[in-house]
Each structure stands twice: as C-alpha cells, then as structure tokens.
C-alpha cells in the first residue's frame, strides 16, 4: 500500500517513516533552490509564502503560460547538497516538513530534520517530464525577478513521487550510511584485485 503524505504535514505524520521508505506527496510543493535559501538565511528576507507543514523541491522548472495560467513542462531535482549550509536553519525558520531533491544531504540537515521533525527525500533523477505530469496546477508564483528556475512556483501535486526517504526524523541518513558500507566492502575487494594485477605498473 502506498504511503501518501498530505499537506499540511504534522510531526506525528513522520514519526514512523524511516530511511529507505518510499512515499508520495499530495498537496503543496514549492520549488525552492539556491537563491531562495540565501535570501532567507543570509539576507533575512522573509519568504512570501507560508511553508509551514508544506514541502519544498530543490528544482529549477521549465514552465509555460497557457491562457491566464502557468503550466509545468519539466521539473527535475537539482543537487540538494548545494543547500546543505542553509537547510537546518531553513527548516527551523519555515516549518517546512518535506525537502525534496537529488542526492543526499549532510549532518546539518540531519540535525535539522531530527530536531524540527522533517524529512529529506530523493526524487529519481532523469524523470523531470514525469514529475511535471504529477503537478496538477501551479497556484502561485513569487520572486519572478529571479528568473524562471529560481522563482518560487507554488504547485499542487497528487501522489507526487516516488520519493525515497534519505534522512528521517530520527537522525538516520541513508546516503551517509551507504557510503560507509560501500567503503567497508570496497577495501577487501580492492586488495584482492591488486593481488591478481600486481604485475601492472
């Protein structure tokens, strides 16, 4: 059975979710990447949309005007680690509950997710057009002076996903754990290979 989170998301909605789980989102998803994080954290400019209980997407979408509405054409995730230095404070200040992106994040985000009860989740890369089909409507747009990729596109999604949980509210970090596991497995394998190819200089 699909695990579907619906905004507004509460802390108790997240307590039984663990890293590695696959979930889906129904409700509000706001594209929010580098400049948005910098404006809030470094420049102290309030975000012109209430993110409390909502989800953000590290993404720079392609949109087009269709009559008096905006239409999502493509919306793929961008590398979440670029926001690592801001994300803990961003979660604290906004009350956002779901951070969607590409790849893992580090210890600051771990701390933010654990302390303020949020998740970081990974949307599969290379599926930007699929993601766009899961956006039912663009409801609002803010900070358009930043250009299309950096604007805040307030989207309504239905069963947006799949989203792989990489950081949960208990401080577990799937990508960090996997890196450690891979390193442990790598060393004996490399050693064995070297025994067979030691003659190669």
Curated annotation (Swiss-Prot):
Keywords: Lyase
Reaction(s) catalysed (UniProt annotation): (2R,3R)-tartrate = oxaloacetate + H2O
EC numbers for this chain: 4.2.1.32
An annotated Gene Ontology molecular function: L(+)-tartrate dehydratase activity
Residues annotated as the enzyme's active site: 37
Top-level division of the source organism's lineage: Bacteria
Pfam family, one: Fumerase_C
InterPro entries linked to this entry: Fe-S_hydro-lyase_TtdB-typ_cat, Fe-S_hydroAse_TtdB_cat_sf
Keyword Isomerase: no
UniProt keyword RNA-binding present: no
Subunit details: Heterotetramer of two alpha and two beta subunits.
Family assignment from sequence similarity: Belongs to the class-I fumarase family.
NCBIfam families (UniProt xref): PRK08228.1, ttdB_fumA_fumB
Protein name: L(+)-tartrate dehydratase subunit beta
UniProt source species: Shigella boydii serotype 4 (strain Sb227)
Lineage, top ranks: Bacteria, Pseudomonadati, Pseudomonadota, Gammaproteobacteria, Enterobacterales
């Amino acid at each position: 059975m699909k695990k579907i989170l619906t905004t507004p998301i509460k802390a108790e909605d997240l307590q039984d979710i663990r890293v590695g789980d696959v979930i889906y989102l129904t409700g509000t998803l706001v594209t929010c990447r580098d400049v948005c994080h910098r404006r809030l954290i470094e420049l102290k400019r309030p975000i012109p949309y209430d993110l409390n209980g909502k989800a953000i997407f590290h993404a720079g979408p392609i949109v087009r005007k269709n009559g008096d509405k905006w239409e999502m054409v493509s919306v793929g995730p961008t590398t979440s680690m670029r926001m690592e230095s801001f994300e803990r404070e961003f979660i604290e200040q906004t009350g956002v509950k779901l951070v969607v992106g590409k790849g893992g994040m580090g210890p600051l985000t771990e701390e933010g997710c654990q302390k303020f009860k949020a998740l970081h989740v990974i949307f599969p890369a290379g599926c930007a057009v699929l993601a766009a089909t899961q956006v039912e409507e663009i409801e609002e747009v803010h900070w358009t002076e930043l250009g299309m990729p950096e604007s805040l596109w307030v989207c309504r999604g239905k069963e947006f996903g799949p989203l792989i949980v990489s950081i949960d509210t208990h401080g577990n970090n799937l990508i960090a754990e996997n890196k450690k596991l891979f390193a442990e497995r790598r060393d004996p394998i490399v050693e064995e290979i070297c025994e067979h190819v030691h003659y190669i200089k």
